[in-house]
């Protein structure tokens, strides 16, 4: 068991693209499985396969290329470079990733209007992401070596995937809807929130 970390480190150095893509895909897919479990539903492996397909074919590859592009365009860890990377990531990268998720999942689910979820949930999800991803990426850009950035984003993406997969299935793209389902899981829908 102790030999897995050196083997993973070697794989990331020798084959950074597939190692990062597979790690990212595995972690985000696990996030989908977790959100199903948190809702008390039976495992829907078909849904998790859809998430895995989308993440491995687009998101993990996009993140791998995007993070390296940001590093080339804005090299270093100086405060101005970090701020510029964060700004570019949130203004350009985040909208692409959120849009691709909602449209991609709608395509894989065979929905008639593949843009409906995007229209209904984009802004809420994007604004929710602004409360999470800048902190993740600040750590990523300032502390994580380039060859591990996609994998690190995948680790943090596990939590994000739990949220965004829930939003795509049941929520409205806000953190409030995700927390509400956790709260109401133990109470009936008629009981509502505790009175103050």
From Swiss-Prot:
TM ranges: 17-34, 51-67, 91-108, 151-167
Pfam families recorded: Mpv17_PMP22
Disulfide bond sites: none
Gene Ontology cellular component list: cytoplasm; intracellular membrane-bounded organelle; mitochondrion; peroxisomal membrane; peroxisome
Cytoplasmic membrane side: 1-16, 68-90, 168-196
Tissue: Isoform 1 is detected in the kidney (at protein level). Isoform 1 and isoform 2 are expressed in the kidney, heart, liver, lung, pancreas and skeletal muscle.
Keywords assigned: Membrane, Peroxisome, Transmembrane, Transmembrane helix
Region (Targeting to peroxisomes) location: 16-55
Lumenal-side segments: 35-50, 109-150
Keyword Transmembrane helix: yes
Biological process per Gene Ontology, one example term: negative regulation of mitochondrial outer membrane permeabilization involved in apoptotic signaling pathway
Family: Belongs to the peroxisomal membrane protein PXMP2/4 family.
UniProt-recorded name of the protein: Mpv17-like protein
Organism name: Homo sapiens (Human)
């Amino acid at each position: 068991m102790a030999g897995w970390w050196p083997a993973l480190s070697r794989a990331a150095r020798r084959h950074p693209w597939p190692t990062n893509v597979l790690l990212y895909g595995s972690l985000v897919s696990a996030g989908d499985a977790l959100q199903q479990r948190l809702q008390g539903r039976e495992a829907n492996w078909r849904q998790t396969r859809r998430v895995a397909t989308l993440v491995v074919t687009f998101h993990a590859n996009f993140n791998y290329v995007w993070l390296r592009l940001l590093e080339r365009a804005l090299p270093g860890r100086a405060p101005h470079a970090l701020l510029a990377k964060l700004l570019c990531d949130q203004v350009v990268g985040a909208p692409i990733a959120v849009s691709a998720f909602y449209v991609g999942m709608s395509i894989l689910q065979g929905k008639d209007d593949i843009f409906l979820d995007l229209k209904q949930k984009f802004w809420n999800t994007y604004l929710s992401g602004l409360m999470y991803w800048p902190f993740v990426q600040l750590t990523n850009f300032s502390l994580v070596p380039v060859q591990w950035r996609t994998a690190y984003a995948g680790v943090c993406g596990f939590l994000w995937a739990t949220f965004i997969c829930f939003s795509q299935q049941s929520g409205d793209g806000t953190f409030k809807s995700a927390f509400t389902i956790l709260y109401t899981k133990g109470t009936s829908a008629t009981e509502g929130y505790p009175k103050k």
